[in-house]
Amino acid sequence: MNIDVVLLLEQNPILLIFVVLAIGLSFGKIRFGSFQLGNSIGVLITSLIMGHLGFSFTPEALTIGFMLFIYCVGIEAGPNFFGIFFRDGKHYLILSLVVLITATWIAYFGGYYLNLDYGLAAGMMAGALTSTPVLVGAQDALNSGLAAVPRHMDLSLILDNVSVGYAMAYLIGLISMIMFAKLLPKLQKQNLSDSAQQIAQERGLGSQRKVYLPIIRAYRVGPELINWIDGRNLRELGIYRQTGCYIERIRRHGILAHPDGDAILQEGDEIALVGFPDSHARLDPSFRNGKEVFDRNLLDLRISEEEIVVKSDSIAGKRLSDLNLSEYGCFLNRVVRAQIEMPMDLDIVLAKGDVLQVSGEKSKVKGLADKIGFISVHSQMADLLAFCSFFILGILFGLVTMTFGQVSFSLGNAVGLLLSGITLGFLRANHPTFGYVPQGALNMVKDLGLAIFMVGIGLNAGSKMFQHLSEVGVQVIGLAFLVSVVPVVFAYLVGAYILKMNRALLFGAIIGARTCAPAMDVVNEYAKSTIPALGYAGTYAIANILMTLTGTIFILLS
């Protein structure tokens, strides 16, 4: 049996998609020292080669890819978008606008000066910013008819130009951003790790520690401890401040009880202490030496670890220190915002949608969750009805046409799906039983949508890529470098000398404005801290939204 592989792939577009994906994802795992190509570059290079060999791609599959991607971007941004936009994100909004306005200005006038074909500059800008949302916005504006097609040009030719520009500039944008993250910190007077340490000191940020579940140990109260207590009740003693442990139970004369703040320990009491292993190890000898007891009932406590989503209006906007976790007998392990783990900063301002990983006795963790929000649903079942319904609403919203005199205007699929995704994400953050999609499932849909979209871009661009490289390759690559680097340098100057931002936060914010996650690892390494993640999370959500709008606006201006 003879199988013509080329004919098989040409006649089976779905098979072609997954063959390119498999090869590209494998290629993306290749490392050059500490640098890894990554999934996007691997898939893009593979699809460009396949496109150059003559393989093509159906526009419908390309469309569903970018629709799923941009919709999931909206869902992820939803919980934090409004908080950043309306409350304390002034600096982050300014930096995002500086990057995008500068990039748009350079790309527009650079494309005009170089007389680039229609659509090529838009794709080049998207690639130089390593921003798929910019590309999505530009292509959707063309497909939806929002942007007029010149009479002498065909729509498919313009879309090919957009794809070619993106493919030519993407690698330039990624490498230049990583190099920026490596070089610019070295050019500062102040070391980046010193900037991070300064924020840590100003905000009472302790050193990062390993996270363990609390453990329970039981001790008998002896004469030494009674002398130390000196008649004070538990509230006056401040056991947690002294030891880092909570007293969960007391057995007195054979009776188990949960103590309140007015309780006074007596000699012979057996107490159950809950705390991290390090806290138990640091206990004063009057607590532990020769006094540990094993009492099955006293130790029978259910320690749980839950992810609590901030929802309460009375909590959002307050500092982490205002939670007074010691009153609830709970331990904070992590703070996650927009899928970025934040430093354990007691002065960080909480926002709706923030996830606090908390451990402690089960009933107390539940009590804390009832106060600040809700426990994240630990379910593998997604609310597909809500997911599909808002997807439909996004498409319908993008089809609505508004007329102003002689001018008709519609948002298009990209903006419509982005807005519906933001709405679903926002509602999910405020209503725990509505619209739940496991984060793993959301990541898979988003990554698969992006990968399919990249396959389509590469296959469509591959057939003309080398022709454009020989004709305008040097000009496009040079312009892409300027679009990638100049806005970042300008944003740095604005942030450092006008906004007076801390350098560690500033670098994270600039990378968030560029939505370039690989560069984030480089900055964290130089800062020897995760503090730059505070800035990254601040700009990431708003930048993703603005980039989609930028792609649409740019193609309208061209």
Curated annotation (Swiss-Prot):
All residue ranges annotated as the RCK C-terminal domain in the record: 203-290, 291-374
InterPro entries xref list: AAE_transporter, RCK_C, RCK_C_sf, Transp_YbjL_put, YidE_YbjL
The keyword DNA damage appears for this protein: no
The keyword Transmembrane belongs to this UniProt entry's keyword annotation: yes
Gene Ontology terms: biological process: potassium ion transport
Family matches, as Gene3D superfamilies: Regulator of K+ conductance, C-terminal domain
Topology class, membrane: Multi-pass membrane protein
Subcellular location: Cell membrane
Domain of life from the UniProt record: Bacteria
Residues that span the membrane, as ranges: 5-25, 37-57, 66-86, 92-112, 164-184, 384-404, 407-427, 441-461, 476-496, 504-524, 537-557
Molecular function in Gene Ontology: monoatomic cation transmembrane transporter activity
Swiss-Prot/TrEMBL keywords: Cell membrane, Membrane, Repeat, Transmembrane, Transmembrane helix, Transport
Gene Ontology CC terms: plasma membrane
Similarity field: Belongs to the AAE transporter (TC 2.A.81) family. YbjL subfamily.
Protein name per the record: Putative transport protein VC_1145
Organism, scientific name: Vibrio cholerae serotype O1 (strain ATCC 39315 / El Tor Inaba N16961)
